[in-house]
Regions:
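Active-site beta-to-alpha loop of glycosyltransferases that engages the nucleotide-sugar donor
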Residues: 61-83, 98
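Short beta-strand-to-loop acidic/aromatic patch adjacent to the donor-nucleotide binding site
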Residues: 159-170
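Active-site-proximal specificity loops/subdomain of glycosyltransferases
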Residues: 51-62, 105-161
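Catalytic-site signature of metal-activated, phosphate-bearing donor transferases
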Residues: 9-58, 136-154, 169-310
Length: 310
C-alpha cells in the first residue's frame, strides 16, 4: 500500500480499487511462489557473493552522493547519460546483467575515464525481468530476483546519500545542482527528496515533444535518500519498489527520459510477450504527444534539441 501521504486527494473509490488490486496481486504472488518452491524444492537460492544483508547498509560512509545504475542492453544513450550525471555525483556504481550489446564495453570505457568515481560490477545470475512470471514467483532474496539485483547495487555504494540513475536519462544539471547543494549542506536524514523526469517523444514533424499518456516519470521512482538499514528495495507484483520510512519532498523536474526515443523498443521487453509489456509498448508506440509549449509544468525548461544528435 502506498504511504498515507500519497493518498491525499485520491477518491474513496480509487483507494478501494487500489486495496483490492494489492490483495489480488499478493494472492497471485503467494500462489506462484508456492508453485516455484514445490518445483525447485527451496525457498530461494543465493550465492554468498550476491547475498544482500541490510546490516551492510549501516557501515561507515563517506560524505557525498552515490548513484546506482543497473543496466541491461542500454548502449543507445548510456555514454551520454553517464557524462550528464558524473560531475554531480561523488561516486557512480554501475551493475550490468547479461547484456548482449556493447553496454559492458561502454561501462569499462567510462570507468577508465573516471576511475576515481566509477566502479563497475557484472552481476552474473540471470535476473528475472520486470513484468515476468518468474519475477512474481521469486523470493526477493533469490539471486535471480530483480529486487536482490537492485539491493546488490545499493550495497556497493560508499557515500552517505544514494540516488538511482538510469542508462537512458540525461540530467538537467542546473536543476539538480540546487538539490545537491541542499543535500550536502543541510544533510537531511529523514527525507526522501524525489524528483521527476520529462518523458520525451518525437512528434509527426520529428521534433521533441512529451508522451501524452505519461508526460512525466513516476515521481517516487527517482530521488535522493540517506542510506540506513530501513532504505532498501522490496518486491512488488511487476517490479521492485523503494522501501523507506522517510518524509517525501518533491523537488520538481531534473532530467530528460529518453526511453521512448529508442529505435529498438523490443530490447526493454527482454523478448517477453506478457500483458504487462503489451500495455507498456502499446502506450509507447502511440503517436499521441503533447507539444513542448503546451505543457505548463515545463515552462522555463528549454526543449533539449541537442538530444536529437546523440
Amino acid at each position: 500500500m502506498p504511504p498515507l501521504s500519497r493518498l491525499k486527494g485520491k477518491s474513496f473509490s480509487w483507494i478501494i480499487n487500489k486495496v483490492i488490486s494489492i490483495i489480488v496481486e499478493n494472492i497471485k504472488i503467494f500462489y506462484f511462489r508456492w508453485r516455484r518452491v514445490i518445483h525447485e524444492k527451496n525457498i530461494y537460492r543465493c550465492r554468498d557473493e550476491y547475498h544482500f544483508d541490510r546490516s551492510s547498509l549501516t557501515k561507515v560512509r563517506g560524505a557525498g552522493i552515490s548513484g546506482i545504475m543497473r543496466l541491461y542492453n542500454e548502449e543507445r544513450y548510456l555514454e551520454s547519460s553517464i557524462e550528464s550525471y558524473i560531475e554531480q555525483l561523488d561516486e557512480l556504481i554501475i551493475v550490468h546483467n547479461r547484456c548482449t550489446d556493447s553496454t559492458p564495453e561502454i561501462c569499462e570505457k567510462m570507468r577508465l575515464k573516471y576511475p576515481h568515481k566509477i566502479k563497475v560490477f557484472h552481476y552474473i545470475p540471470s535476473v528475472a525481468p520486470p513484468g515476468s512470471l518468474a519475477h512474481v514467483a521469486l523470493d526477493p532474496r533469490d539471486e535471480r530476483s530483480l529486487v536482490n539485483y537492485y539491493n546488490f547495487a545499493l550495497s556497493k555504494t560508499t557515500k552517505e546519500y544514494v540516488m538511482k540513475v538510469d542508462g537512458d536519462c540525461i540530467l538537467i544539471a542546473d536543476a539538480f545542482l540546487k538539490i545537491r547543494e541542499y543535500i550536502l549542506s543541510k544533510k537531511p536524514s529523514d527525507e526522501y527528496n524525489y524528483f521527476f523526469g520529462i518523458n520525451l517523444k518525437y512528434n509527426d514533424m520529428g521534433e521533441l515533444a512529451l508522451r501524452k499518456s505519461a508526460p512525466l516519470t513516476a515521481g517516487y521512482d527517482h530521488g535522493i535518500f540517506k542510506v540506513s538499514k530501513n532504505t532498501f528495495f522490496k518486491h512488488a507484483y511487476n517490479y521492485e519498489v523503494f522501501s523507506h520510512k522517510l518524509k517525501e519532498k518533491n523537488n520538481g523536474i531534473v532530467f530528460f527520459h529518453l526511453k521512448s526515443l529508442k529505435e529498438d523498443l523490443a530490447v526493454d521487453s527482454h523478448g517477453l510477450d506478457t500483458e504487462f509489456y503489451r500495455g507498456y509498448f502499446n502506450d509507447r508506440l502511440s503517436q499521441d504527444v503533447i507539444e513542448w509549449d503546451d505543457f505548463p509544468q515545463i515552462r522555463g525548461i528549454h526543449r533539449p534539441d541537442h538530444i536529437k544528435s546523440l
